[in-house]
Design a protein with these regions (language model features):
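A structural signal for small-residue-enriched, beta-sheet-centric alpha/beta enzyme cores
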Residues: 8-9, 18-23, 30-119
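Short, small-residue-biased leader/transition segments that mark boundaries at the very start
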Residues: 2-3
Length: 119
């Protein structure tokens, strides 16, 4: 649903906003070191009509047999996973494909975050 997409976008954009704020605080001398040690990003994925898809839009999410959200850091470590069988159970293999897709998607999002921050 729209909430899930907004949630993933909020995590990605919120992390950038927090990083910009800590950069400003560090430059002004209000903090001595940057407490943020890793990038954090989130992405949705799911199984729609038997096919694994990344970053589901509203129509895909509404039709999904399985729906998942992954939150990871730039080292590929997991922060949160939410995965539900919406219409039918899914296999471990299907989950692993979604996990792999989400990992690759998050790598791309982290690159966009770095670009936005001129890192």
């Amino acid at each position: 649903d729209v909430y899930k997409r907004q949630r993933c976008a909020s995590i990605c954009g919120g992390w950038v906003a927090l990083k910009l704020a800590t950069n400003t605080l560090k430059k002004s001398g209000q903090i001595k070191f940057d407490p943020i040690t890793r990038h954090v990003a989130a992405i949705s994925c799911g199984i729609v009509n038997g096919e694994q898809k990344l970053d589901l839009n509203y129509q895909e999410d509404s039709a999904a047999e399985t729906d998942a959200n992954f939150v990871m850091d730039d080292k590929g470590e997991l922060i949160e996973i939410q995965c539900s069988a919406e219409k039918k159970p899914f296999s471990k293999e299907e989950f692993e494909i979604m996990f792999s897709m989400a990992s690759e998607g998050i790598k791309k999002i982290v690159e966009i975050q770095k670009s936005a921050l001129d890192e």
